[in-house]
C-alpha cells in the first residue's frame, strides 16, 4: 500500500484538489530545468512559468507550495550537496507509475531548460549529451517491466537524474560569469 503522506503524493493531492491535472514530477522537472538553464530564482517568474503549465493562475495554497518548492531547489543547486531530490512517487508505487513520473519529470525539465536557455550552442558536449539522455529517458517510460531488472534500470536512471541537473546548472552558471580581465604585461 502506497504511503499517502509522501511529498509527491501530498503535492499531487494539492494539485488535484485545486483542479490541476499536472503531475508533480513534471512541475518539479520544469522548475529544475528552468533553474539549470540560468533563469535564476525569481519567484514571480517561476510562478508565471508554472501557471502556463498549470493552464491557470495557481490558488494561494498552490502558489505557496510552488514557492516552497523553488526554495528547496535553490538550496539544492546552490548548496554543497552533489545530488538533487527528485519529486517522484515512493519506491512502493508500481514501477509503471514511477517510470511514467520519471518520463514526465524529464519532459518538464526539457521544457523548462528549452524555454530559458539563452544559447545552447555554448553548452559543452557533456551537457548536450545530458539533454539528449533526458530526451531519451522521457520516451522509455513504457519500456520498464515489473521485474528485478526493470527495478534496477529504474534506480540507475533515477540516480543519474539526481546528478545530471547539477552539471547543467554549473555549466550555465559559468556562462553567466564574465571572463576575468587579463593582467597587462607592462
Swiss-Prot record:
It comes from the Bacteria. Pfam families: UPF0149. Coiled coil: none annotated. Disulfide bonds: none annotated. GO terms for cellular component: cytosol. SUPFAM superfamilies: YgfB-like (SSF101327). Belongs to the UPF0149 family. This is UPF0149 protein Pfl01_5435. It comes from Pseudomonas fluorescens (strain Pf0-1).
Amino acid at each position: 500500500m502506497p504511503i499517502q503522506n509522501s511529498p509527491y503524493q501530498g503535492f499531487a493531492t494539492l494539485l488535484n484538489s485545486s483542479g490541476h491535472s499536472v503531475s508533480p514530477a513534471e512541475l518539479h522537472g520544469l522548475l529544475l530545468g528552468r533553474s539549470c538553464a540560468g533563469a535564476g530564482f525569481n519567484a514571480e517568474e517561476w510562478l508565471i512559468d508554472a501557471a502556463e503549465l498549470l493552464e491557470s493562475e495557481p490558488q494561494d495554497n498552490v502558489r505557496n507550495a510552488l514557492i516552497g518548492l523553488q526554495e528547496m531547489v535553490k538550496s539544492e543547486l546552490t548548496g554543497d550537496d552533489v545530488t538533487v531530490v527528485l519529486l517522484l512517487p515512493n519506491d512502493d508505487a508500481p514501477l509503471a507509475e514511477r517510470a511514467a513520473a520519471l518520463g514526465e519529470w524529464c519532459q518538464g525539465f526539457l521544457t523548462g531548460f528549452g524555454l530559458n536557455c539563452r544559447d545552447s550552442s555554448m553548452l559543452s558536449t557533456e551537457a548536450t549529451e545530458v539533454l539528449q539522455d533526458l530526451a531519451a529517458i522521457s520516451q522509455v517510460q513504457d519500456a520498464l517491466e515489473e521485474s528485478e531488472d526493470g527495478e534496477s534500470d529504474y534506480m540507475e536512471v533515477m540516480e543519474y537524474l539526481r546528478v545530471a541537473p547539477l552539471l547543467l546548472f554549473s555549466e550555465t552558471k559559468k556562462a553567466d560569469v564574465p571572463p576575468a580581465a587579463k593582467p597587462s604585461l607592462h
